[in-house]
Amino acid sequence: MSKTWGILMLSVLSAPSLAETELTHKFCGTSMQTRAWQPLPGLKLGMVDIRANDVELLGTQSAEFTGNVDINTVNMSLSAQTALIDKQRGLLNATGPITYRDKISEVNSTGLNADLNNSAISLLGAQYSLTQQLGKGGAEKLTVDESGLMLMNASFTACPGEVPVWAIEADEINLSREEGWGETYNAVLRILDTPVLYLPYFTFPLDERRKSGLLTPSFSSSDRYGLETITPYYWNIAPNLDATITPRYMSRKGLQLQTEFRYLTQEHEGLVGIEYLNKDDSDPDLGDRYMFHWQQKSYLGENWRANVDITNVSDDNYLTDLDSNYASKTDTQLYRTGSLTHMGDTWRTDITVQNFEVLGDHLESYTALPQISFTQTAPWQYDNFDFSVSGEVSHFTNSSAIIDQATRIHIEPKARFDYKEHAWSFLSEVSILQTNYKQHGDLEGTQYSESVSRTLPKVRLYTQLNFERETSYFIDDGIQTLEPQLQYLYTPNEDQSDIGLFDTAKLQDDFFGLFRDTRFSGVDRIAAANQFTLGATTRLFDKKHQEVFNFSAGQIFYLSDSAKPTEQGLNSDTNYNALFAAQTMVHWHRRWYLSAGIQYDTDGKQIIQSNVTLDYKGDDNELVQLNHRYSDDVSGNAIEQTGLFTSIPVSDEWQFIASYHRDLENNRSIEVLSGLQYESCCWAFQITGHRQIVTDLNQSIGQQQATFDSSIRLNFVLKGLGSKSRYDAKKLLQQGIFGYRRPYFLND
């Protein structure tokens, strides 16, 4: 029989509504997946549907139901053998076996007591499982109220099986719907039913909301650091403020404190990182060792932007010796800049203060204090003609240089004619480069002048054609393009040896560099030019219009000897008079990708630079990458290196990764990395072995001087007590000197 009782208080009984989390049933199958609960169709808020084999009325306010009792509301359902409801006192008692279900949990117990007036349900001898995340356990007493679940003498695990890999047993476990966190009191962590750790108080997440607490620690051992433990603590200061405080203990160096503070306001977002080691036990003469990093972006009204990016270290070998999250151990200089930008309708103005901290035994760079630059973003236009002006005012200082102070004023008016059609385009530019210098220092007996004025015209003519045809070569129903390019560039030759080098460096001579209108990044050197550049690109597109192949090649042809780089006497890197550059990409299969490039001196019959990379990317994090690179001049030395990256899934749970890099010039390995990762739905671990060359930036390391560091690192995570996101084994390949980089065109 069935009878509906108007007990309104039952309508407010509900369990915590936990945020949905992606369940990794790929690993655990459906052994822990509890069927999602749905309310009885037709029920409305405040209604109670009670069905039983028999019912006995005990006066006007109470009733006893017996035999296959089912009680349903819009928030929960209850199955029991008997149930006694006292409407006047607001009490519900049921005896078992009992099954209680709601949106987030399913509980089997021997008895149930409900205080309807206080919206609380207590179940005795409970075995529970969660429906919106992996989790199960037992409790002598389980209480459900509006805030969540409270379990007494209880257990919790996210692992399947009769003997879970890990479980928490505690005097009390609270699962809070309001805060999204669970907390335990007097808990013991068991691994394979063996107690391993006592936790007086412990918290863990139920959804993605942030809360202060310890994060997953990591452990490693290496020649350089000895035994290393990293134990981060997360501090959720406010919704827009947080910090991570990380003690890092190294048995051979000491205790380092790493802190990171993040903030977000309506106008600013930023990060401040500080790393500090009071004394390096391996080299006490170094004193305090530290790193400071500050990065901020500011939005100051509609047209104003500000940026800060500052990194500073205590000594040149800090990065190579201690590593950091804010810079790479391969960095040889640190960027420090602050800028204020105004973006108007016609002009963009930047006020910048910048400096490079050069690491190692090298000359210090100049500091720009400040540099004010302006660019016309909306040129004056007439038909296909436009006219624009750009320029800058900069003041440089460097106490260790011959020129210790300098002021540079540069202005560059430019007239352009730009005409474009579908099949071709033509561009002509005429510029006047006017630069004035005031240079101060002990200049007597040097080539530098105190005052310099330099005026140079520049003419650039550029045209490109676009041909297209259907093709069946190498690909069905494909399209091939041919894009020849031609450029003429003229700038007269002028002796610039009386000008210092303040912020100017030689640019890369790749295929795209052949068609630039300058060889340098700054204006302290303006290279003479009287040259044609001829090049072409061909591409293949499949029937889905995806690019599967391209090849580009080009060369500069000089019309006068004075325009050749070796004849200009510029203080720059090695110059080449007949530079040929080519590059290619082949993506013949969705899993395969090949890229290569070369720069060749046709006069000297030598390769300047070359690189080639072959990538394979399969399913489930399967990848292989082979690479080779060569350069005839890197800080005065030739380098030739080859490398291998691989990530192989052994099974659904196991992943193997490895990388190897070799210095062919000196015939030695420079980095070896191998690792193994296991991940299931309830726990994961990573173990890596790493051997790499150690660099001392204060000296040149030859083959006999090279030293190596070997290390083993272990990360262990109990899933369900921390982040629920899946691990990515490829991230292990990014930890070394030569980090893995995903191929640009590989989209699958």
UniProtKB/Swiss-Prot annotation:
Signal peptide: 1-19
Chief subcellular location: membrane
Subcellular localization, as worded in the UniProt entry: Cell outer membrane
Biological processes, Gene Ontology terms: Gram-negative-bacterium-type cell outer membrane assembly; lipopolysaccharide transport
GO cellular component terms listed in the entry, alphabetical order: cell outer membrane; transporter complex
TM segment ranges: none
Organism domain of life: Bacteria
Pfam families with a match to the protein in the record: LptD (PF04453), LptD_N (PF03968)
Keyword list, A-Z: Cell outer membrane, Membrane, Signal
InterPro entries listed in its UniProt record: LipoPS_assembly_LptD, LptD, LptD_C, OstA-like_N
Subunit (UniProt): Component of the lipopolysaccharide transport and assembly complex. Interacts with LptE and LptA.
Functional note: Together with LptE, is involved in the assembly of lipopolysaccharide (LPS) at the surface of the outer membrane.
Family, as annotated: Belongs to the LptD family.
PANTHER family: LPS-ASSEMBLY PROTEIN, LPS-ASSEMBLY PROTEIN LPTD
Protein name in the entry: LPS-assembly protein LptD
Species name: Pseudoalteromonas translucida (strain TAC 125)
